[in-house]
């Protein structure tokens, strides 16, 4: 009886740990990038790092989704991705030819934060659509 109780207790503990791990894994961690509110040099690094983090996340999620798809679905996802990239770039793109000043640098920082935020939204949408943890 004692052996059976211990076995049931261990099985219950294992199930609890597994369900906790699964629910922790299932959460999509959203980053909030508030880079514009800090000293310029750190703000610039913050925005650039945000892009790196979010592009890496999107690449991982996209590739995991892509591997699950058949040929037709892959083409569809590629087409959607290209359209999304154009939309994101139209929304967030910043280009300046001329002398740099603080206003221009902060505009670039804002554009980079926009790119990171839009990329994060795309990662979340693909992860949700294809049930990627």
Question: Where do the PLM segments sit?
Answer:
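C-terminal segment of classical bacterial N-terminal signal peptides
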Residues: 15-25
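N-terminal alpha-helical modules
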Residues: 23-133
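Generic detector of short alpha-helix boundary/capping microenvironments
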Residues: 12-14, 110
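Bacterial N-terminal signal peptides that target proteins for export
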Residues: 1-12
């Amino acid at each position: 009886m004692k052996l059976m109780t211990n076995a049931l207790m261990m099985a219950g503990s294992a199930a609890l740990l597994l369900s906790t791990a699964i629910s922790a894994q299932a959460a999509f961690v959203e980053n909030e990038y508030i880079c514009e509110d800090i000293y310029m040099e750190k703000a610039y690094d913050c925005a650039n790092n945000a892009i790196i983090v979010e592009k890496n996340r999107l690449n991982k999620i996209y590739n995991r989704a892509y591997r699950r798809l058949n040929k037709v679905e892959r083409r569809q996802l590629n087409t959607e991705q290209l359209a999304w990239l154009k939309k994101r770039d139209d929304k967030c793109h910043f280009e300046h030819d001329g002398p740099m000043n603080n206003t221009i640098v902060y505009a670039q920082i804002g554009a980079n934060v926009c790119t990171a935020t839009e990329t994060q939204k795309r990662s979340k949408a693909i992860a949700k659509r294809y049930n990627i943890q």
